[in-house]
């Protein structure tokens, strides 16, 4: 048995079982095997006086309000550690790779603290961060200040870029920090292709919080929806942790909002949605983002969770494969379910994609311990991942790759399923290569 080091109580996985369930054995990726052929490059030799080991930091929320985003971390980290077990070969030199994973606790201050510890005490060569602005933005800021290359994901890119001080006119606001994620354009595409599948009055009640994500969505998605012919009813920003939404619910009822859209933390949505049902607000479409991403979040709502519309940044239906592990999206989802007994969740894809990008960046330079060179390599990286092909330099700015997000719905699972709910894709406007399963059904 191989216990995962640091970063919370992950439990254990048997490596042979992991290789079998993930399909890695077929790809020849064993701990005793040679270094990954895909990670070999013909760069110049390094000085033998310096350590030939690399440290990769990984920060995600394992506890706190966003803990569901970290649910699959143990599985992904073990896949990455197994694939990197023989090290990375660069210019004829083999570098052993250590992954140092840390819990940001869904808290900006703690996320900044663990990032600074990884930078200053552990002296990581590359940082990875994922899941919500509360975790990702402070980690990215710490790396930018320290000159440590960082790749992050699962924060709408506008929240990451503008929330950290980037300006619309800047084509490259940051030197060391890079990001891949969906943005407002992808949400707009998803919503305007998903919502017309149900007959509505096109009046949208929105509940957008007073945080970096909510403010970015308010400034950008709201006007786009209006331009697309929707009437947006916005009762104003609310504070995370609000426990009484009566005034907002009354506003939505008075305006006869057939559509409801929100970007809250999970606990806030649970409070709002229960109060909405109790107070008689029953929209035809309830569109969630930031929450309603994971089965556990929706199952916790009971019957009122069935039929919620959501948005997927990855599912096992994505026709893409990890370049590091050679595991397909379907096998990634199946392997997780076989190894853990839990239902697949969206975070599997982008979390593994971080390690695809990390391996590609570290092997794209002659000296993987040259932080400036690694950062420059990320800026022109082109790598295959479970979420699709990531190509920096072709995005909305030089720091960002915009990735798809697709609209879908939580449905009761078919008879005989191991799990009570299933997320089905209903539109694919941001990536037509991903198959659609069905059409959106109204809540009422």
Locate the predicted segments by residue.
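N-terminal secretory signal peptides
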Residues: 1-17, 26-33
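Solvent-exposed, acidic/polar segments of extracytosolic/periplasmic ligand-binding ectodomains
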Residues: 382-444
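Extracytoplasmic "Venus flytrap"
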Residues: 57-80, 102-109, 131-132, 207-216, ...
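Beta-alpha junction/loop-to-helix N-cap segments that form part of ligand/metal-binding clefts
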Residues: 41-49, 68-73, 87-166, 238-245, ...
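Extracytoplasmic ligand/sensor domains, especially the bilobed periplasmic-binding protein
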Residues: 124-235, 285-310
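Extracellular/periplasmic periplasmic-binding protein-like sensory domains
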Residues: 276-352, 364, 422, 426-443
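Short, charged, surface-exposed loops that flank catalytic or proteolytic processing sites
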Residues: 363-376
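C-terminal segment of N-terminal export signals and the immediately downstream linker at the start
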Residues: 34-59
């Amino acid at each position: 048995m191989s216990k995962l080091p640091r970063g919370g109580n992950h439990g254990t996985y048997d490596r042979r079982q992991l290789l079998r369930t993930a399909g890695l054995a077929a790809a020849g990726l064993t701990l005793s095997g040679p270094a990954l052929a895909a990670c070999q490059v013909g760069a110049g030799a390094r000085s033998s006086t310096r350590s030939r080991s690399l440290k990769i930091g990984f920060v995600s929320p394992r506890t706190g309000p966003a803990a569901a985003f970290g649910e699959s971390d143990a599985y992904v980290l073990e896949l990455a550690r197994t694939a990197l077990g023989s090290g990375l070969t660069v210019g004829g030199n083999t570098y052993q790779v250590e992954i140092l994973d840390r819990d940001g606790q869904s808290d900006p201050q703690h996320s900044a603290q663990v990032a600074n510890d990884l930078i200053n005490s552990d002296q990581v060569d590359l940082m990875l961060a994922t899941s919500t602005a509360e975790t990702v933005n402070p980690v990215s800021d710490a790396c930018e200040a320290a000159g440590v290359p960082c790749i992050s994901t699962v924060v709408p890119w506008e929240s990451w870029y503008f929330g950290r001080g980037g300006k619309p006119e800047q084509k490259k606001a940051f030197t060391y920090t890079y990001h891949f994620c969906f943005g407002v354009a992808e949400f707009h595409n998803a919503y305007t292709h998903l919502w017309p599948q149900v007959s509505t009055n096109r009046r949208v009640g929105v509940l957008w919080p007073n945080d970096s994500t909510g403010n970015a969505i308010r400034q950008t998605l709201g006007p786009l929806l209006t331009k697309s012919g929707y009437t947006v009813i916005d009762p104003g920003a609310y504070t995370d942790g609000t426990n009484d939404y009566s005034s907002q619910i009354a506003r939505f009822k008075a305006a006869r909002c057939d559509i409801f859209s929100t970007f809250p933390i999970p606990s806030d949505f649970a409070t709002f949605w229960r109060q909405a049902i109790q107070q008689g607000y029953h929209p035809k479409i309830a569109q969630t983002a930031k929450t309603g991403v994971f089965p556990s979040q929706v199952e916790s709502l009971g019957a009122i969770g069935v039929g919620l519309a959501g948005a997927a940044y990855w599912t096992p239906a994505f026709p893409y494969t990890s370049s590091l592990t050679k595991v397909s999206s379907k096998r990634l989802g199946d392997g997780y379910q076989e190894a853990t007994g839990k239902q697949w969740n969206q975070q599997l894809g982008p979390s593994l994609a971080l390690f695809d990008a990390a391996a590609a960046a570290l092997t794209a330079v002659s000296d993987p311990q040259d932080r400036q060179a690694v950062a420059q390599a990320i800026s022109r990286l082109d790598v295959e991942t479970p979420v699709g092909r990531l190509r920096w330099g072709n995005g909305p700015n030089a720091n960002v790759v915009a990735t798809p997000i697709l609209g879908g719905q939580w449905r009761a699972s078919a008879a005989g399923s191991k799990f009570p709910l299933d997320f089905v894709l209903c539109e694919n406007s941001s990536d037509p290569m991903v198959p659609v399963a069905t059409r959106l059904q109204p809540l009422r």
